[in-house]
Amino acid sequence: MPALAAEPQAMRFATEEWPPFFSRALPGNGLTGTLIGAVVTRMGYATQIDYFPWRRAMEIGLHDGGYAGVVAMVRNPEREKTCYFSSAVGSRHTVLAYLKDKPVTAGALKDLETVRIGTVGGYSYGEQFDALARSGALAVEPAISDEINVRKLLARRFVAIVIEKRMLRYLLAAERYTQAERDRVETADHLFTTRSVHVCFQHTAQGLMQQRAFDQAAREVDLSRIERDYWRDMQVPGAAPVKP
């Protein structure tokens, strides 16, 4: 009998449930999970994605020797010190969400100083927003998930929340929300820029080698086509790719 082919070694990553980008309930572990999986397959490995609360995911992904890193993260100067970032594996477009019957008007982030804003602990929303929040210029209240913030917004416990645009649409498309609730939510899209996201490989010699191998493999994979096909198959209203 011919010998059975050996199973490829798994490359493990830590993340949190963040549909439609990462979820154990979605095909390929979500859109970004699918993109990463395609590159890792090209490298000759299988992909294993484990789910934790976000702060725990960062701790495990960056420091547990059984993991290659954390997926997926926006680059900023602070994070550059803790990991080796891959080339882009997608993008995120943060928006300010509020209720139509209580609109929030702001020409720039600094104009939100009187608005109580829901965020998620451990997330980066861009250097400007993060700096304003750290300085106390913005009144932010961290929660443990975007889902909780959406519920708080609808319950009027927040005047506004910051959230990824396509994730908001995905969450509101769930059956637990009525069409009337979906229609109550409006977004301001101009306050944040679209940002690329990356695999955050551990800041070790092995992590650097993995990051370089990942980037080489990514150049041989048509990630844009995979993303287009994924959104088409998902058929989530308004969830077309956002160009970086």
Give the predicted meaning of each segment.
Residues 15-17, 91-95, 179-215, 238-243:
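Periplasmic-binding protein-like
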